[in-house]
Design a protein with these regions (language model features):
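Flexible, glycine/charged-enriched surface loops at secondary-structure junctions
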Residues: 84-89, 219-223, 298-302, 328-339, ...
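C-terminal segments
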Residues: 3-6, 11-25, 29, 138, ...
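Rossmann-like NAD(P) dinucleotide-binding subdomain of oxidoreductase/dehydrogenase enzymes
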Residues: 143-285
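Buried hydrophobic positions in well-ordered alpha/beta secondary-structure cores of metabolic enzymes
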Residues: 20, 90, 112, 163, ...
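Conserved C-terminal structural/oligomerization subdomain of aldehyde/semialdehyde dehydrogenase
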Residues: 373-458
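N-terminal Rossmann-like NAD(P)+-binding subdomain of aldehyde/semialdehyde dehydrogenases
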Residues: 1-154, 182, 324
Length: 458
């Protein structure tokens, strides 16, 4: 798929206006005012569009509210209406949401990329369509019955009510779609406080969902959002008496605040997912799939592979095969140049470095250009051999740069992977034909997601 906006991969302001106008027309059902031509501006690939500091009055409606109180009150009313509907009615709502989100997956992806400047449009389209199709719906709400000498016990699922959801700038639209389908299927309503740097695409997403719900006969404002999201509005949502459950996707700070809010919280925080490759692995299969996973959306997805620990004896061949499958393998001199531009603070061995935020989620070619390294074509991933203690191994870099380090045997590789994962319990994986080794690593690292012989997004 060709990338929008020419060789830089970033949409112009004019293109953003066209996409936003098209989405507004779909939501309202009538033509929107076409944007006036803008004077030409210098192209840039590093500075994302700034989110507005206030929402104009015409931006409200279709689930978008000026205050947290208004959004929660409206969602509470909608929840009670939904609670009175049949499960069949809820199924129609979810079907309508899926249809709308699949139809608008591409435009939402382009709008998210244009606003945030992160990742790749083609991968964001995949994410939007994947969560639209695969997120569980009402079909999983199966009652469980247990009968015995003492009688019959029937267990049925019940909704919480109003859920407060906080979403990231890395995966703004796909997170909203996933949360909505899962939470509404379970009978809840939602108030979103989105990341300020992804406000425009997120508001467009909420409006489309609102339209899909009401079109299917569902209650208005079942899914709402705060028009001008801030840190303060997120804190207000977390402490609001009308919110019974929090669902937070973000960094360690916002996750920590949610976990200490006094409310029940479901949180997805930071990770540093390692992948181990041992001597029994199919190296060509491993190389191809590690590249696919680590390069996906320029590595901004929290489950993407962040470092490889390979057993010494197969490391050279693994790196060679990665090069054959399209990765750009950096030499020692190029590694030095790249680390000088991607890190603003370089603390030393086995320490997490501070990232250059302007390069998070950027294409590999842009990182190479910033480092003064010639690039041919558009490599999806940079691969580099490093020592065990290199900061790339210990830092969740969220860039298409994959460090490969080594261990003398599979046991030490698993131990190093556990250390590099920092105990987050997020994601990890392994390539091996040794069932015992696969099971041993899964038990040892004990992450929420453990992938065997495949990319982590599988």
């Amino acid at each position: 798929m060709s990338r929008p906006g020419g060789s830089t991969g970033v949409l112009t302001d004019r293109q953003v206006d066209i996409i936003a106008t098209r989405l507004a027309e779909r939501v309202s059902g009538k033509p929107a005012d076409r944007p006036a031509p803008r004077p030409p501006v210098a192209a840039t690939t590093s500075a994302p569009r700034r989110a507005p500091t206030s929402a104009p009055r015409e931006a409200l409606g279709d689930g978008v509210f000026a205050t947290v109180d208004d959004a929660v009150d409206a969602a509470a009313t909608a929840f009670h209406e939904l609670d009175g509907m049949s499960l069949e009615g809820r199924q129609k709502i979810i079907a309508s949401i899926r249809e709308s989100m699949f139809e608008n997956a591409e435009e939402l992806a382009r709008l998210a990329h244009a606003e945030t400047g992160l990742g790749r449009v083609e991968d964001k389209i995949v994410k939007n369509r994947l969560v639209t199709r695969k997120t569980s719906g009402t079909e999983v709400l199966t009652p469980q019955a247990v009968t015995g000498d003492s009688g019959l016990t029937l267990t049925e699922y019940a909704p919480y009510g109003v859920i407060g959801a906080i979403t990231p700038t890395t995966n703004p639209t796909s997170t909203i779609i996933c949360n909505t389908i899962a939470m509404v299927s379970a009978g809840n309503s939602i108030v979103f406080n989105v990341h300020p740097n992804a406000r425009e695409c997120s508001m467009a997403n909420v409006r489309l969902i609102h339209q899909a719900i009401t079109r299917a006969g569902g209650p208005a404002n079942l899914v709402t959002a705060v028009a001008t999201p801030t840190i303060e509005s997120a804190q207000e949502l977390m402490s609001h008496k009308g919110v019974r459950l929090l669902a937070v996707t973000g960094g360690s700070g916002v996750v920590r605040q949610a976990m200490t809010s006094g409310k029940r919280a479901i949180c997805a925080g930071p990770g540093n997912p390692p992948v181990v490759v041992d001597t029994t692995a199919d190296l060509d299969h491993a190389a191809r799939n590690i590249i696919a996973g680590a390069s996906f959306d320029n590595n901004i997805v929290c489950v993407d592979e962040k470092e490889v620990i390979a057993v010494d004896s197969i490391a050279d061949e693994l790196v060679q095969r990665m090069g054959h499958h399209g990765a750009r393998v950096l030499n020692e001199r190029e590694l030095h140049k790249v680390t000088n531009v991607i890190f603003t603070e370089y603390p030393g061995r086995r320490q997490r470095a501070t990232l250059e935020k302007d390069l998070i989620g950027k294409n590999a070619s842009e990182i190479l250009a910033r480092a003064g390294i010639a690039s041919h074509g558009d490599p999806r991933l940079l691969v580099v051999r490093v020592s065990n203690g290199h900061p790339l191994v210990w830092t969740e870099q969220m860039m298409p740069i994959l460090p490969i380090t080594t261990a003398p045997d599979v046991e030490r590789a698993i131990e190093l992977a556990k250390e590099a994962e920092h105990g987050f319990g997020h994601s990890a994986g392994m390539y091996s034909r040794d069932i015992d080794a696969l099971s041993r690593m899964a038990r040892t690292i004990n992450t929420s997601i453990f992938t065997k012989n495949g990319p982590f997004f599988a």
